[in-house]
Amino acid sequence: MNVFWFIPTHGDSRYLGTAEGARAADYDYFRQVAVAADTLGYDGVLLPTGRSCEDAWVVASSLIPATKRLKFLVAIRPGLSSPGLSARMASTFDRLSGGRLLINVVTGGDSAELEGDGLFADHDTRYALTDDFLHIWRKLLAESHENGSVDFDGEHLRAKGGKLLYPPIQHPHPPLWFGGSSPAAHAIAADHIETYLTWGEPPAAVAKKIADIRARAAERGREIRFGIRLHVIVRETEEEAWRDADRLISRLDDDTIARAQQAFAKMDSEGQRRMAALHGGKRGSRQELEIYPNLWAGVGLVRGGAGTALVGNPEQVAARMREYAALGIETFILSGYPHLEESYRFAELVFPLVKGGDARRAGPLSGPFGEVVGNGYLPKVSQS
């Protein structure tokens, strides 16, 4: 089981929908979160993309020297940059980071934002363009290891004599990750992607996605891995966890929720539509927002994209993770508010349950020990 964390380049806070409890989203803070994730034993970090975020490539590049083993899941944007430029960026990053790059292919689901960035294309056209883009991108990086060139004549993109002089460390290219819930998105995943990402829907819905994509990939003679994107609120007791879930949205008012839901409704993203359907745009009670045991839809009231959280004590959260893992999920990309403190909390409480075979995560060897007791004794590993 792989566990990733998240760099909050679109802001961070103790509460959703208010400036109260917010903290500066700057390099010093991003670095703190990245170093924490690296030190605690997370396998990688996701950096979000879009106009609401700092640029993912610039931020990720700045964090390379601050980290030792952490992998970076960074977006390429078909239609907003060329496949050749994106391939060069990926190869350079992979080389400078020592092979620590993962690529998140983001087609985009907000037409207004995309048009603001200069891309005027409907939903299916964007996915057709993504298909052309990935054919060129993959070939450029693969051919770079043999000093080859690429010619491609697609419906939306063409390349003639395309060449990449400096190959990436990873062969044939940094692994491709991708998420999308429409049939067009599933076809892209089956054709090109190494790891398909789903947002945190209930297990039955996730299982249905996995089955469809596996079947499509098998028809093409391919196998695909799967990951899931979730928030997490884990505490020593279930009562504490639900109390903090309620606290996270305690500053939300109906107007803020309505404005957020109106913005999401204008998108043509099937995934965003499915997220919104989980809560219906209404605040509701804890019972109404708990859409499956320990799966809470409160975050999605005002946050676009991933809108559900695992909520509970360590054993409950670990049990839900194992339930998803039994469906085929290998990677969990998690986040929590605020991201620095929650990275420690999750690692301390849940890693011993889901990473028990990994000594680096499972418990103290050379440390950490906690504060020395009585100036001469190390604390016990557990207190009863």
UniProtKB/Swiss-Prot annotation:
One function term, GO molecular function aspect: alkanesulfonate monooxygenase activity
Annotated keywords: Flavoprotein, FMN, Monooxygenase, Oxidoreductase
EC number(s) recorded for this UniProt protein: 1.14.14.5
Catalytically driven reaction(s): an alkanesulfonate + FMNH2 + O2 = an aldehyde + FMN + sulfite + H2O + 2 H(+)
GO biological process: alkanesulfonate catabolic process
Role summary: Catalyzes the desulfonation of aliphatic sulfonates.
Family: Belongs to the SsuD family.
HAMAP family according to UniProt: Alkanesulf_monooxygen
Lineage: Bacteria, Pseudomonadati, Pseudomonadota, Betaproteobacteria, Burkholderiales
Classification via InterPro entries: Alkanesulphonate_mOase_FMN-dep, Luciferase-like_dom, Luciferase-like_sf, SsuD_RutA_monooxygenase
Protein name: Alkanesulfonate monooxygenase
